[in-house]
Regions:
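Long, highly charged, low-complexity intrinsically disordered interaction regions
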Residues: 1-30, 39-42, 249, 259
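Short, surface-exposed secondary-structure boundary micro-motifs
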Residues: 83, 134-135, 586, 600
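Short boundary/loop segments of OB/S1/cold-shock single-stranded nucleic-acid-binding domains
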Residues: 58-78
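Structural detector for short beta-strands of small beta-barrel domains
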Residues: 74-95, 133
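Upstream accessory/linker segments immediately N-terminal to the RecA-like ATPase cores of bacterial MutS
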Residues: 37, 90-281, 654, 687
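C-terminal accessory region of SF2 helicases/translocases
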Residues: 605, 609, 617-710
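Inter-lobe coupling/hinge segments of SF2-like helicase ATPases
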Residues: 292-295, 305-628, 687-691, 710
């Protein structure tokens, strides 16, 4: 694969106009910005003067009116004028500077824990100040701690005529300094217009201002601006910037896909007919949705450009067998396929499934994981390097040095959000010895709503498996308060007597692995005592991988009836005999996590149940989450509601598209902009390619390389 070109290489920008030259000026061109301050500003993503314009306010404060001290209430933020009546150093636990000011209607204390001698001298008795800060009740009455203030020359001073922006800060750049620098950048904007990369014929959603108008408004909103609208991100000025930001991200993903498609790939013809024989040998038939997804993949695999396809579908929908059929096409073409799973446990489960499916065809499937005995590992690696073994399953160990493939034509990645882009790239690069890039099939059990998928995964083709195999019954879900815990334990005893198995998922009381392990151990001990005839096992994150796998395999074999676990089973083994799951402290978990956990039961023909055990009082958000999980087993509906409740960042996990770090846009809130974003992206790529690099540099960074895999 050729080195991935940057956007500027793919789409060189036109020569700079005077406005663009101003836009490219380094931030050190501003008065008072030396190397040290420039280094601090770089942490905010500011290297050019124009970058300051895109450091947008987090919120606004109304300093356009002065409040009487006597009318102040604790908890409000206010501007006040007053004369210093007393300044003193106090020692109440720590050294502090106290100033008492009065405006005739009341007295207010200003408290400073960090101050200099010159600051103390400047706050002399009789000095008039204008202060702004949060009012709170202190030991001496109402006070402000470290308020912003300035001295007043006369009895009064002009008030602010716009709302005051509050910007995100970085260490060493105080709010006032950043505000002044952005003000200087705005003055430059007045003198030399910022380049608007959107062409005149781009049809923006109605009511959106120009780029210059939008930036001016957001940095200096008039006093009559609607704070609620700005706080909600719904003002037309914000939507204008959100549109451009979404467009920049969408373009970069499309270019990543285009760059990838310019590389040659193996054309998998399957002359041996292995795919057909694989499907005929299966003990079940594919569903319509599985067949459709496989057809998509087969068409891609027959082409001479690399497939990069996302296979998404709910827990238990049968993604693995589709991936295995794609692997059969590679093997039938005399080439190799590798399936990479996020854990050794899941890798072994996939290996067992593929081993059984490929056995009737005489095709050996190798497992490569960290836990293999040295001799077995050496033998497997030699067979992979020679091409004798054509289907390989493993963990991240697959992309490590020392593992060589003869002719790797297909890379399958399970639970893609658990791997970074670079990990997938390293595995794909192992297939480039013959100058061809392997095809990639990326599986995820996180159903992504269509609108979000079209934007967040614009660099991938998408197949959806939207039905479960026949015989699967929906999991009956109930929400139960902690006070009925005894009834839940009795239900576990009943299930175990009937020969069924049970999961008990432990509460997430703390982020610490140690505390989670302790909670799991205490829960297991308590349940063992309450259920004397039941064989109880334990799995938590602090156990050695071998011990964890041993417990999970014992559960799968039926030697353990009740498995107490932390959320390490979220992606785990397939145990059709497990028909009951109890999720303790369910109110602490997110929708997607609850749905993923619930997917561990209901994998056989027997009716299954999930108990969501909660502790009161429930927040409104937690109540809504539990209600959604109780009412729906549809992963796509749950993902849609999850997106509404949490936003796209968490839903996408560590997906490295930058969409989780959007500065202005919000994929759920701004979903109505996306169709127009996609239209505008096509217009720019077709007719204004010289604008693409500038737009991406503004919102994402000129140094980013977008031709990467995945």
């Amino acid at each position: 694969m050729r080195p991935a070109p940057g956007l500027s290489a793919q789409y060189p920008a036109a020569g700079p106009s005077p406005g663009e030259r101003a836009e490219q000026r380094p931030v050190t061109a501003l008065h008072g910005v030396g190397a040290a301050l420039a280094a601090r500003l770089a942490r905010l993503g500011v290297t050019r003067v124009s970058d300051l314009l895109f450091v947008l306010p987090l919120r606004y404060e109304d300093r356009t009116r002065v409040s009487a001290i006597g009318s102040l209430q604790s908890g409000v933020r206010a501007a006040v004028d007053g004369e210093i009546q007393l300044t003193e150093i106090a020692y109440r636990g720590r050294r502090q500077l106290l100033c008492k000011i009065s405006d005739g209607s009341g007295m207010l204390t200003l408290r400073f824990f960090h101050f200099s001698a010159s600051q103390q001298q400047g706050l002399a008795r009789g000095t008039r100040l204008r202060c702004f800060g949060e009012v709170r009740r202190g030991p001496l009455g109402l006070e402000m701690v470290h308020p912003e203030y300035r001295r007043l020359a006369g009895d009064t001073a002009a008030l602010e005529d716009t709302l005051t922006p509050i910007y995100p800060l970085t260490e060493g750049v105080p709010q006032g300094r950043l505000r002044a620098l952005i003000g200087a950048s705005l003055r430059e904007l007045e003198r030399a217009a910022l380049r608007d990369w959107l062409p005149a014929e781009a049809v923006l959603p109605p009511g959106l201002p120009s780029l210059k108008e939008a930036l001016g408004y957001l940095h200096r909103p008039p006093r009559e601006a609607q704070l609620a609208e700005l706080a909600a991100g719904r003002h037309p000025a914000q939507r204008r910037l959100a549109f451009e930001e979404l467009l920049a991200h969408h373009l970069t993903l499309k270019l990543r896909k285009r760059a990838l498609k310019s590389d040659p790939a193996w054309e998998l013809a399957d002359g041996a007919g292995l795919t057909r024989r694989f499907l005929e040998a299966l003990p079940f038939s594919l569903t319509r949705a599985q067949s459709r997804a496989l057809r998509d993949a087969q068409e891609d695999l027959a082409a001479s450009v690399p497939m990069v396809r996302l296979l998404q579908g709910d827990v238990g929908c049968g993604k693995t067998v589709v991936a295995a059929a794609a692997a059969a096409r590679a093997a039938g073409s005399g080439l190799q396929a590798a399936l990479m799973a996020p854990t050794e446990l899941l890798a072994e489960q996939h290996w067992r499934s593929l081993r059984d499916w490929f056995a009737p065809l005489g095709e050996t499937v190798a497992l490569v994981s960290g836990g293999l005995p040295a001799r077995t590992r050496r033998s497997a690696l030699a067979a992979i390097a020679s091409g004798e073994i054509r289907v390989v399953v493993g963990t991240h160990a697959l992309f490590q040095a020392g593992i060589d493939f003869a002719r790797l034509a297909l890379v399958i990645v399970d639970e893609q959000h658990r791997f970074g882009v670079q990990q997938r790239l390293r595995l794909a690069e192992k297939g480039q010895k013959q100058g061809r890039l392997p095809h990639q099939l990326i599986m995820t059990a996180t159903p992504i709503p269509r609108t979000l998928a079209m934007t967040a995964y614009a660099d991938l083709d998408i197949s959806v498996i939207d039905e479960l195999p026949p015989g699967r019954t929906p999991v009956h879900t109930v929400v139960v308060p902690e006070q009925r815990r005894v009834e839940v334990v009795a239900r576990i005893a009943q299930a175990c007597r009937a020969g069924r198995q049970v999961y008990w998922v432990c509460p997430l009381i703390d982020e610490s692995d140690e505390l989670r392990a302790q909670a799991a151990e205490e829960t297991a001990a308590g349940l063992s005592e309450a259920l004397p005839g039941v064989r109880v096992g334990l799995v938590h994150g602090r156990m050695p991988a071998a011990a964890k796998d041993q417990a999970m395999l014992a559960f799968k074999a039926g030697r353990i009836q009740l498995l107490v676990a932390t959320t390490v089973i979220e992606v785990g083994v397939d145990v059709p005999n497990a028909t009951l799951m109890v999720i303790d402290n369910a109110e602490r978990m997110g929708l997607a996590q609850l749905h993923q956990l619930r997917g561990r039961v209901g994998r056989g023909a027997e009716a299954s149940s999930c108990v969501l055990l909660y502790r009161a009082p429930l927040s409104a958000l937690a109540r809504e989450r539990l209600k959604v999980v109780r009412e729906s087993c549809d992963g796509f509906e749950i993902a849609r509601r999850d997106l509404e409740l949490r936003g796209p960042g968490e839903l996408l996990g560590t997906r490295q598209t930058g969409l989780a770090q959007l500065r202005v846009a919000d994929l759920m809130r701004d979903a109505d902009l996306l169709p127009r974003v996609q239209e505008t992206a096509e217009l720019l790529l077709a007719s204004y390619p010289e604008n693409v690099a500038g737009l991406a540099a503004r919102w994402i960074g000129a140094g980013e390389r977008y031709g990467r895999v995945g």
